[in-house]
Amino acid sequence: MHTGQIIQLLAGFYDVLTEDHKIVRTRARGNFRNQKTSPLVGDMVDFKESENDTGYITKIHTRENELVRPPLANIDQAVIVTAATEPSFSANLLDRQLVALAEKHIEAILYFSKTDLLSPTEFQDLQKIAGYYQKIGYQVIFPISSQPDADLIELKESFKNQLTIFMGQTGAGKSTLLNRIDSKLNIATGEVSQALNRGKHTTRKVSLIPIEDGLVADTPGFSTYAVFEMADTQLKEYFIDFKKLSQNCRFRECLHLNEPGCAVKAAVEDGSVLSSRYANYEQFIELIRNQKPEYKRKGYQKKDRRKKK
């Protein structure tokens, strides 16, 4: 019996990286279908090797976390590639991504791409926004043309012993950035459609690539997230700046909406919290509250209303 981590799924085969850095091509046993589960890229698995050089996965280890889109497991950190322009910067999308990652216990690294395309005024405005996210505790990489390699050095230092994903709005430059990190990757890139201001999807498969003593996934770009599957009372826990300030709220269960003595609202009013952060928080609360019930819960079975013969 051997143990390793799935680094690629392609045409029904799972490539597993072993502890001695050997890659073994495997298939999943049929019993996983009976368990209503299947291996994901990033899974730690046990497998048996066979004589025809194709192994068989026998066990999937307990996952630390997982994403549905893209289908990945055991992610340590995510580099959110946020376009400064083309497509336009979206604080709403960035905050959605940060909440989604925090809910999955995935550390976030903010990378602002295409900063060289901004005017001096636009550059300064976005740099202030980036500075706020850095101040509240996020690792932020904001490329400066006078220091062309500083961003890559900082990124590479963060990869060691981590499973890292790259995510962000379509056309933000995830694949372009990975090509800069390691030219041998030769990942396809696409231009942004001028008509739709949306990038063409260029990444076709889910795989993990060994880089700087870590594993990096290049994942399909996407620009929206489903409504968060959480109670409205939970959302405040994933706004790290709000969480720190809430200790000074008059009420312990303050939702930072209409309650008197709210430290978060006071911070928004005096400018120490970005107004866009609070506006996004209010919008996300409404999205959660207006979410339709999910009836396909575990254990739920639709009644058969057909008449028995």
From Swiss-Prot:
- Its main localization is cytoplasm
| Free-text remark on how the cofactor is bound | Binds 1 zinc ion per subunit.
Supply the HAMAP family for this chain.
GTPase_RsgA (MF_01820)
Q: Where would you find the membrane-spanning parts of this chain?
A: none
A family per Pfam: RsgA_N
The family this protein is said to belong to = Belongs to the TRAFAC class YlqF/YawG GTPase family. RsgA subfamily.
Gene Ontology MF term list = GTP binding; GTPase activity; metal ion binding; rRNA binding
Query: What is its quaternary makeup?
Result: Monomer. Associates with 30S ribosomal subunit, binds 16S rRNA.
- Residues holding GTP: 113-116, 168-176
Residues binding Zn(2+), per UniProt: 249, 254, 256, 262
From its record, what is one biological process in GO terms?
ribosomal small subunit biogenesis
Q: Enumerate the spans annotated as CP-type G domain.
A: 64-225
Secreted among keywords: no
The name on file for this protein is Small ribosomal subunit biogenesis GTPase RsgA
Enzyme Commission number(s): 3.6.1.-
**Which UniProt keywords are given for this protein, alphabetically ordered?**
Cytoplasm, GTP-binding, Hydrolase, Metal-binding, Nucleotide-binding, Ribosome biogenesis, RNA-binding, rRNA-binding, Zinc
Q: Which residues form a coiled coil?
A: none
Among PANTHER family, the record links this protein to: SMALL RIBOSOMAL SUBUNIT BIOGENESIS GTPASE RSGA, SMALL RIBOSOMAL SUBUNIT BIOGENESIS GTPASE RSGA 1, MITOCHONDRIAL-RELATED
Q: Where in the cell is it found?
A: Cytoplasm
UniProt function note: One of several proteins that assist in the late maturation steps of the functional core of the 30S ribosomal subunit. Helps release RbfA from mature subunits. May play a role in the assembly of ribosomal proteins into the subunit. Circularly permuted GTPase that catalyzes slow GTP hydrolysis, GTPase activity is stimulated by the 30S ribosomal subunit.
